[in-house]
Amino acid sequence: MSWLFGIKGPKGEGTGPPLPLPPAQPGAEGGGDRGAGDRPSPKDKWSNFDPTGLERAAKAARELEHSRHAKEALSLAQMQEQTLQLEQQSKLKEYEAAVEQLKSEQIRVQAEERRKTLTEETRQHQARAQYQDKLARQRYEDQLKQQQLLNEENLRKQEESVQKQEAIRRATVEREMELRHKNEMLRVEAEARARAKADRENADIIREQIRLKAAEHRQTILESIRTAGTLLGEGFRAFVTDWDKVTATVAGLTLLAVGVYSAKNATSVAGRYIEARLGKPSLVRETSRISVLEALRHPIQVSRRLVSRPQDALEGVILSPSLEARVRDIAIATRNTKKNKSLYRNVLMYGPPGTGKTLFAKKLALHSGMDYAIMTGGDVAPMGREGVTAMHKVFDWASTSRRGLLLFVDEADAFLRKRATEKISEDLRATLNAFLHRTGQHSSKFMLVLASNQPEQFDWAINDRIDEMVCFALPQREERERLVRMYFDKYVLKPATEGKQRLKVAQFDYGKKCSEVAQLTEGMSGREIAQLAVAWQAMAYSSEDGVLTEAMMDARVQDAVQQHQQKMQWLKVERPDSQTNKPPHPSLLSC
């Protein structure tokens, strides 16, 4: 059984290290220090020992020694021993690796500490350098300040020195001027005294010289008067005695007077003739009649106007069907009147503003092949006393037209008011009488067309001179839609398709949009619809990309509707009937 514990074995076996000794008992050392009562007796130590286990172990060892598997058991024990040794060696290697890792960690920590130390030293050096630089800068700034203070002190001293020198120089100059003034005063005083003394001594001689000069001057004037009188008397005597010279002189003066007055009157007559034939009266604002000056300024336009053919009277004019038929009859009758050289009829066109009265008057003149002239009633009152003469000039000028003239008086109620009830000036009353005098009979030279928003204010004599009354009412739904389409095409679509202007139109249903606009613009006139189309064009031009969108059109329509409502509110406030809650006069809104 000795081989089991590795004591007696063959060579080469059991070469492992001896088993470690069991640790000493805590009470083994220093046991003498304890008391006698603490040390157990040998009898007590082995009294509870059970030898059964040792017996079983000895028995197992004997069986194993006599067993045939003893070698395998020994090999197994050796392998276990080798395994334990390998485990001990691996633990030793791990311990060595841990030691090496600890050393490397120490080296890393030392390197990190060294790096931190170097960084701190570098920072300290930088801080020290910055502090030294700061001190150097402060020293330099202090030097600059000291130098600046020194320079300022030197400059102040120099200025004080200059001021002192200037004060000394000024005092010197003043003293010099004072002395010079004193010397000058003394010299003048001496000269005055000397001159006074000389005058006193030469007083008799001076008086004699003055007396001689006055006598000589008097003698010269008397001789000049005698000579001039003698010459004039002899000349007049010679002229009177010669009757041929007298007759020639009288005839010459007479002819000169006759020539001056004749030239003056002839010039006045020629001027009035030229003004009546070639010029344009001051009351006429616009006319299609061609003048010599206009022909010289615009020959191409004048030639085109001369060769132009009569146009349709309702081209570009949108009216209701009944009104369109009536005005077309008036246009046809006017054209036939011109062809037959008959008498023209006077027409009154009344209705709200912006319904096409002026436009139809122009188209009527072009359709009939006549010239047109437009005058405003508001221009008559400011002329005062010249109004009568200006009114006669207008009718004289209209009577000289070879093609016939359509005289359109816009805002005629401004000066054709009732003479009995209205308070008008004497000059305006005289102008009205002149107008009534010139329109008392029908004429084959001109046709009178009056336009008014308040026809009830006309004088009764004016109503008596009117042959045809036409009411231009506000456009209805169909007329508004036609107007919207026409102006949308004129101011939006045509500029966008021509490509010459910065205007584009977004993609949407134009016809549907025009119908919606016509529905929203109820109560608006044709002029307001045209202004709305112009506002669309302006909004497209003012946008960033130059594109007119449907939203932009809707916004402008809403603004136009609000403005129209505000105008109607103002109209109700301005009308006298608003105090009694009565509606405005029908001529201001519709027919």
Curated annotation (Swiss-Prot):
It is found in: Mitochondrion inner membrane; Mitochondrion matrix, Mitochondrion nucleoid. It is an enzyme of class 3 (hydrolase). It is a single-pass membrane protein. It comes from the Eukaryota. Its EC number is 3.6.1.-. Disulfide bonds: none annotated. Residues 289-304 are annotated as: S100B-binding. One of its GO terms (biological process) is HRI-mediated signaling. Residues 2-49 are annotated as: Required for interaction with the inner surface of the mitochondrial outer membrane. Expressed in heart, spleen, kidney, liver and at smaller levels, in lung and muscle (at protein level). Pfam families: AAA, ATAD3_N. Residues 2-245 are mitochondrial intermembrane. The modification N6-acetyllysine is found at residues 490, 494, 512. InterPro entries: AAA+_ATPase, ATAD3_N, ATPase_AAA_core, P-loop_NTPase. The chain crosses the membrane at residues 246-263. Residues 55-216 form a coiled coil. The transmembrane domain and a C-terminal adjacent region contain all information necessary for mitochondrial targeting. Essential for mitochondrial network organization, mitochondrial metabolism and cell growth at organism and cellular level. May play an important role in mitochondrial protein synthesis. May also participate in mitochondrial DNA replication. May bind to mitochondrial DNA D-loops and contribute to nucleoid stability. Required for enhanced channeling of cholesterol for hormone-dependent steroidogenesis. Involved in mitochondrial-mediated antiviral innate immunity. This is ATPase family AAA domain-containing protein 3A. It comes from Mus musculus. The gene is Atad3a.
